[in-house]
């Protein structure tokens, strides 16, 4: 009898929760008169992502393609209303013109329960602004130039380790190889550690890199779209093992990159040859050890996954388009002959390579969606929508980059899209691989250089062809937030 009563109470409670969820929480856009995509309980419009059917980039790409004529439309991420911006002028409004009302990403950040979440990418409001001012001088072209020799050495080691494979005209899996190269680069530039992942693919540095990006779509969805849930239940997004690893090995204390040490000791970064203007009054607000560790952590996250996936996609496309591969190789040869060796200026003068990397990020944007949250209520210009504080905003970058109205024949790999005249003819917010506005990626220069050096190191010595095991087109892994290929990318490598 008691069991029957408990079951009855459970069913009634579940029914009440369902009704409240569906007819109250998921009724927001209908009440506001905004066109919306019909949601389901309990994930809203994220069901296909949290169940592993689509990547988050594909989910919002598909919604954009279907509903872009509405300019803006409503969706639900779990119980939260989410306004998707499909109009380029409105995207500029959110990212730049009305930045004061949309300055936060709305993703999980709680330094008390997860100290390593207190980094530049996630921090809100004033904390973000103060840290951005401190960190901006660490990513000037002058500072990247100072790091160039480290990057070059990693690239040379990278190419050298593939010599035997090339001589045998063997098949290589480039997704893993570029991940190991990226690990070596980040560990060298951020921590002063020679990780040797190219020689030792299963060492502890590669192990922890894999662990950070292990597949967990449900938690990724909470991080991006429902941070309040993680906050309420005190769920740290960063695996505690990663924190313990840093503490046990004293990586931050003894091997931390020099620029962050300056921020800890002085509160500002010393000026380089670009005559950076530093706010020396900030010396009273030096970075703490935990704050510095958080910045090192995001440096690894941002530099590792985005650059390695971009390089992977790029070489995949070049293996299919031998004419483009040959044209890049010709440019590399010309620049090396002109400069005598690989230099910072030589890489920057490789204009065709730059177009190829840009086209790669157009077709495969590393971060396929941009998130913002409304921090100050406002009327969205040229619409009848009043955006209330706390409303999540999503910009479907992957959808924009594959829109045939913006990029004709969007599935075609065509570096000429980034000729100066083509760029000038497009809306400036039609290409967003690094975001835009005040919260544009601070490490854009570093990301470009890391990717280009990896490609130059390989293409100057080797040729690449597609292996029959690699599908055309590629399919995407459903779990990661970054647009990642599913399975391996197998290419045949041979000497020039």
Q: At which residue positions do the language-model features occur?
A:
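N-terminal membrane-proximal hinge/A-helix region immediately C-terminal to the signal-anchor transmembrane segment
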Residues: 2-119, 126, 130, 152-160, ...
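Conserved cytochrome P450 K-helix E-x-x-R motif and the immediately C-terminal K′/meander segment
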Residues: 47-70, 342-384, 394, 404
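Cytochrome P450 heme-thiolate monooxygenase catalytic core
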Residues: 103-115, 146-309, 327
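C-terminal helix/juxtamembrane-tail motif
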Residues: 2-3, 262, 482-496
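Cytochrome P450 heme-binding "Cys pocket" and the immediately downstream C-terminal segment
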Residues: 322-324, 444-482
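Conserved cytochrome P450 K-helix/beta-meander segment immediately N-terminal to the heme-binding cysteine loop
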Residues: 395-422
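Cytochrome P450 heme-thiolate "Cys pocket" and heme-binding signature region
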Residues: 137, 297, 302, 421-451, ...
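Classical protein tyrosine phosphatase
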Residues: 84-86, 92-94, 192-197, 201-203, ...
């Amino acid at each position: 009898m008691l069991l029957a009563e408990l079951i009855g109470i459970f069913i009634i409670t579940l029914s009440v929760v369902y009704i409240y969820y569906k007819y109250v929480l998921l009724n927001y856009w209908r009440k506001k008169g905004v066109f919306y995509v019909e949601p389901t309980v309990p994930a809203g419009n994220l069901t296909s992502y949290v169940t592993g059917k689509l990547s988050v980039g594909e989910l919002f790409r598909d919604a954009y393609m279907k509903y872009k004529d509405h300019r803006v439309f409503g969706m639900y991420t779990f119980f939260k209303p989410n306004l998707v911006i499909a109009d380029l002028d409105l995207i500029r409004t959110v990212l730049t013109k009305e930045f004061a009302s949309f300055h936060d990403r709305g993703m999980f950040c709680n330094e008390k329960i997860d100290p390593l979440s207190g980094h530049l990418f996630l921090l809100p409001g004033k904390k973000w602004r103060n840290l951005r001012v401190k960190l901006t001088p660490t990513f000037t072209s002058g500072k990247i130039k100072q790091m160039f020799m480290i990057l070059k050495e990693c690239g040379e080691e990278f190419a050298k380790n593939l010599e035997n494979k090339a001589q045998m005209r063997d098949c290589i899996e480039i997704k893993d190889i570029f991940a190991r190269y990226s690990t070596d680069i980040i560990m060298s530039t951020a921590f002063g550690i020679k990780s040797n992942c190219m020689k030792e693919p299963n060492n502890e540095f590669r192990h922890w890199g894999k662990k950070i990006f292990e597949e967990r779509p449900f938690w990724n969805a909470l991080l991006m779209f429902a941070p309040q849930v993680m906050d309420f239940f005190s769920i740290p997004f960063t695996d505690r093992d990663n924190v313990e690893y840093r503490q046990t090995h004293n990586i931050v204390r003894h091997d931390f990159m020099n620029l962050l040490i300056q921020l800890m000791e002085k509160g500002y970064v010393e000026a380089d040859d670009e005559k950076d203007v530093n706010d020396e009054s900030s010396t009273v607000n030096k970075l703490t050890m935990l704050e510095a560790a958080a910045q090192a952590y995001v440096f690894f996250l941002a530099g590792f996954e985005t650059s390695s996936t971009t390089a992977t996609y790029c070489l995949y496309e070049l293996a299919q388009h031998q004419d483009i591969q040959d044209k890049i190789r010709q440019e590399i040869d010309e620049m090396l002959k002109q400069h005598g060796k690989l230099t910072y200026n030589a890489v920057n003068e490789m204009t065709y390579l730059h177009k190829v990397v840009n086209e790669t990020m157009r077709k495969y944007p590393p971060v396929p969606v941009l998130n913002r949250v409304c921090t100050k209520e406002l009327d969205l210009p040229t619409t009848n929508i009043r955006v209330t504080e706390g409303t999540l905003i999503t910009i479907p970058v992957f959808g924009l980059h594959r829109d045939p109205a913006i990029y004709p024949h969007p599935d075609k790999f065509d570096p000429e899209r980034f000729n100066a005249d083509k760029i000038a003819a497009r809306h400036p917010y039609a290409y967003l691989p690094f975001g835009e506005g005040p919260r544009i990626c601070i490490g854009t220069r570093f990301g470009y250089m890391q990717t280009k050096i990896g490609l130059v190191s390989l293409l100057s010595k080797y040729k690449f062809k597609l292996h029959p095991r690699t599908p055309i087109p590629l399919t995407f892994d459903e779990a990661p937030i970054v647009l990642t290929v599913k399975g391996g990318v197998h290419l045949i490598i041979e000497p020039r």
